[in-house]
């Protein structure tokens, strides 16, 4: 079908091209999986909802393979996501280039964000390197097409309509869980 950032399904199903910024996001819908005899094998799951591609740990290998330009997905994303992810990749690319004699940036200027970029802190459906090292499991998020967020804790106690979390992070008013 495709993978995050390169889809043809939207155009085929709705005449809206995801590759032109008008994705109808059919991959985020629920589907039933039916076998050849018509028996439903899986019902109402997000069977086409792939995780977000993240090869930031492989930037050096990609540069060594001859990649000279990186496309960073950002369609339908907010400015906070773009700022965070682009800054993250910029730091990774600069670090990789600095350790390779004979390589240099093709542009001038510097970017110095006033925060530590971390894609896991932005909207994410989970991450995958897809098939960078061959076929692997875990490229899809069958349970939800939404941001999976980060682990905040386990429910330690339930008291009527209230519950208590035990975990590694402090929560603040307005945090969504």
Language model regions located:
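Surface-exposed amphipathic alpha-helical tracts and adjacent flexible/coil segments at the periphery
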Residues: 1-177
